[in-house]
Amino acid sequence: MSFRPVIISLVVLALAGLALAFAPTGTTARPDQGDARPFQLRDTDGNLVTDTSLRGQVVLLYFGYTFCPDVCPTELGYVARVLRALGDDVERTTPLFVTVDPERDTPELLKGYAPLFHPRIRALTGTPEELAAVFKTFGVTARKVPGAGSHYLMDHSSSITVLDRQGRVAATIGSTDTIARSVTTLRDILGKP
């Protein structure tokens, strides 16, 4: 009797189990496109930033944290490449980095972090309650993964939500898309009234 099919089946089951074990929990469905999303947060200077204050602008929202070891720098680097590829159209966009870790991401830390990727990226924060409301509004999950001592990671959603000039969810982009595809998507949204 050959044990090869049994071994292959066990390996596949083990990999599937690992994938489920490390999958984000408590996921919230992403909101449907087309609806305006009210929210209220603060920038790193303490200024109020709301959905209404951003009307008339095409907004790129990314939720992450400064201590993120891999996904956040990758996605913010992607946002920066897309912004550079937009050329002069970049002036008509507002890229925002919203923290999922207000405990460690102080306004001072955020102020120095976001522009490292691109000078147009502004960081936003808020109280845990304000952030939880924004997470719910945009279907973002974020939870602390305990580590040793004060070291921990955040398990969070990772996509870039694009809002049109009326504050409606118009698209979702991310580093799995080509730069050209995201630029085309943004230019289409920028061209719409």
Please state what every model-predicted region is.
Residues 130-185:
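Thiol/disulfide oxidoreductase modules built on the thioredoxin-like
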Residues 1-38, 42, 192-193:
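N-terminal targeting signals for export/organelle localization
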Residues 52-75, 79:
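Short active-site neighborhood of thiol/selenol oxidoreductases, capturing the structured segment around
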